[in-house]
A protein has these predicted regions:
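Active-site-adjacent core segments of small-molecule enzymes
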Residues: 1-496
């Protein structure tokens, strides 16, 4: 549970300074006479203004606009043959916090913009916190973390004008064909969920599970909404952005207040460890899915959101999700995007919130002890008993590492140090899965809306070169799609 709020309303309460001293006035500064200057020793006025100047922390460089809630996850099935993780053992119920977000928009931007949605879950397990930091899409735009700053820059605002720019977005996308699968997903109905309650969530990356016998498996997570999938059209989303920029945030909070608790069923895809070496698709490529015909969904359990935060800043804005937070039985994979995020996320939290961000109640473990030798640093709150040494190893009985308990996971790799793309597998092209999404998964109405969404976006591109490259990009996804986009853009330009 979170901490007890301060300052409950009760008769006879009085205003104090931050150190508990009563103050003389909420309305008037201390001045030299009624019309004279404010004196510097009015400590309360100085404190009040100085605190106000420092209320904001840096917003997240991505996923700035968001909301969240508490709930629980209950494992209803037996997947112990695949993982020893305590939270995924049959019947175990685990407290959790989830944060939903858009990616590119600022903290005050409309949450109904067309954008992927963050789907980050913090499980407060008995073995420590496990953070599953995913999206509402099973894939992403790039497959190597070194390109992430460039990608995000292309989706943000122009440095000179401060405006978002279609040319910049399509220039990056069309020069990076690995983005085709995700852009097709984004430009379709799935890019505009009607509410956060009506969208699925995905771990997106490939992770490793380890069972009690030490057997290793590769795993992908799928959270299927129990509310059903519902989407906005572009016109509906635009209208809602003007009416209520916080529609998704408001809808989630009010649903929980009504007792209409949203829920998701968790499924996983399991790939035997050895399969990854010869599978026709690189199983660690974040721009690809694993076809369900090869690796079907296996039910794990149920996530329910049943409690709103008491304070948005303390519990949502300061919430810090890190892909590096694993628990025994769950580990990383050779996914180059995941490996980059394992570094970058906790680094961002240290900058944005502070060195000791993990000690904040929302980020600290709720069901497991913390035993380590870190100490000091800005805003340190917790500290070890004076009898505990500050170094390891020691002969004084302090905590010691336990490799068997930790179970960090592993994989084999060798070769020279190189800067190169993944080794290509037989089906590792950039367009075939996007083509399947268009040709097989979507129906006629969905394809029609996809063409409309793409053409509206590409039609706003000013550069002839970039626009033509965007047309070729969609030709590569599917010739029919490319042709329809060209025709729609031309028709809009001619006014027909």
């Amino acid at each position: 549970m979170y901490q007890t709020p301060q300052n409950p309303i009760h008769p006879g309460s009085y205003t104090t300074t931050s150190t508990g001293t009563p103050v003389a006035s909420d309305d008037h500064s201390l001045t030299v006479g009624a019309d004279g200057p404010i004196v510097l020793h009015d400590a309360y006025a100085v404190e009040k203004l100085a605190q106000f100047n420092r209320e904001r922390v840096p917003e997240r460089v991505v996923h700035a606009k968001g909301t969240g809630a508490y709930g629980y996850f209950e494992t209803t099935e037996d997947v112990s043959q695949y993982t020893r993780a305590a939270l995924f053992q049959p019947g175990v119920k685990t407290e959790l916090l989830i944060r939903f977000s858009t990616v590119a928009g600022e903290s005050g931007s409309p949450d109904t913009w067309r954008d992927p949605r963050g789907f980050a879950v913090k499980f407060y397990t008995t073995e420590g916190n496990y953070d599953l930091v995913g999206n509402n899409t099973p894939i992403f735009f790039i497959r190597d973390a070194i390109k992430f700053p460039d990608f995000i820059h292309s989706q943000k605002r122009m440095p000179g004008s401060g405006l978002r720019d279609n040319d910049m977005q399509w220039d990056f996308w069309s020069l990076n064909p690995a983005s085709a699968h995700q852009v097709t997903w984004l430009m379709g109905d799935r890019g505009l969920p009607r509410t956060l309650r009506h969208m699925d969530g995905f771990g997106s990356h490939t992770y490793q599970w380890i069972n009690a016998e030490g057997e290793r498996f590769w795993v992908k997570y799928h959270f299927k909404t129990e509310q059903g999938n519902e989407f906005f059209t572009q016109a509906q989303a635009d209208e809602m952005a003007g009416k209520d920029a916080d529609f998704h945030r408001r809808d989630l909070r009010e649903a929980i207040e009504r007792g209409n608790y949203p829920a998701w069923t968790l499924y996983v895809q399991i790939m035997p460890y050895e399969d990854a070496k010869t599978y026709r698709i690189n199983p660690f490529d974040l721009t690809k899915i694993w076809p369900h015909s090869d690796y079907p969904l296996i039910k794990v359990g149920r996530m329910v959101l049943d409690r709103n935060p008491q304070n948005f800043f303390a519990e949502i804005e300061q919430a810090a999700f890190s892909p590096s937070n694993f628990v025994p039985g769950i580990a990383a994979s050779p996914d180059k995007m995941l490996l980059g995020r394992i570094f970058s996320y906790p680094d961002a939290h240290r900058y944005r919130i502070g060195t000791n961000f993990a000690q904040l109640p929302v980020n600290a473990p709720h069901a497991a002890p913390v035993n380590n030798y870190s100490h000091d640093g800005s805003m340190r709150y917790n500290f070890n008993d004076p009898s505990v040494p500050t170094y390891a190893p020691n002969s004084l009985g302090g905590p010691h590492a336990d490799a068997e308990r930790a179970d960090e996971g592993s994989w084999e790799s060798d070769g020279e140090l190189v800067r190169t793309a993944y080794t290509l597998r037989p089906d590792d092209d950039d367009f075939s899965q996007a083509r399947t999404l268009y040709e097989v998964t979507m129906n006629d109405e969905e394809r029609e809306r996809l063409v409309s969404n793409i053409s509206g976006h590409v039609g706003a591109v000013r550069s002839d070169e970039i626009r033509e490259r965007a047309f070729q990009y969609w030709d590569n996804v599917h010739p029919e799609l490319g042709s329809r986009v060209r025709e729609a853009v031309a028709a809009a330009a001619s006014g027909s």
